[in-house]
């Protein structure tokens, strides 16, 4: 038995009532910038690793 659409809507409504839309919006933007920073650091690490490997050979 999974969670139905109605149950998800009720949970979403309760979360919005508890935290408010402004706080949730701020949390979403903070999470998005954290994910972008993580992706950038991973891609920078791969670039550095590839540059080190090519300089060694």
UniProtKB/Swiss-Prot annotation:
Query: For this chain's UniProt record, which GO biological process terms are given?
Result: protein transport by the Tat complex
UniProt GO MF annotations: protein transmembrane transporter activity
Can you list the GO cellular component terms from the UniProt entry?
TAT protein transport complex
Listed A to Z, the keywords are: Cell inner membrane, Cell membrane, Membrane, Protein transport, Translocation, Transmembrane, Transmembrane helix, Transport
* Pfam families recorded: TatA_B_E (PF02416)
Residue spans with biased composition (Polar residues)?
44-57
Q: Localized where?
A: Cell inner membrane
- Residue intervals passing through the bilayer: 1-21
Q: How does it sit in the membrane?
A: Single-pass membrane protein
The ranges of region (Disordered) come to 37-57
The record's principal subcellular location, in a coarse class, is membrane
State the source organism's domain of life: Bacteria
How does this chain assemble?
Answer: The Tat system comprises two distinct complexes: a TatABC complex, containing multiple copies of TatA, TatB and TatC subunits, and a separate TatA complex, containing only TatA subunits. Substrates initially bind to the TatABC complex, which probably triggers association of the separate TatA complex to form the active translocon.
Q: Which NCBIfam families match?
A: tatAE
| Record's function text | Part of the twin-arginine translocation (Tat) system that transports large folded proteins containing a characteristic twin-arginine motif in their signal peptide across membranes. TatA could form the protein-conducting channel of the Tat system.
Protein name as catalogued: Sec-independent protein translocase protein TatA
Species this chain originates from: Stutzerimonas stutzeri (Pseudomonas stutzeri)
């Amino acid at each position: 038995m999974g969670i139905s659409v109605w149950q998800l809507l009720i949970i979403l409504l309760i979360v919005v009532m508890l935290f408010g839309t402004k706080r949730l919006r701020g949390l979403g933007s903070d999470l998005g910038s954290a994910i972008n920073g993580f992706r950038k650091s991973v891609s920078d690490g791969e670039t550095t690793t590839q540059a080190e490997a090519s300089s060694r050979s």
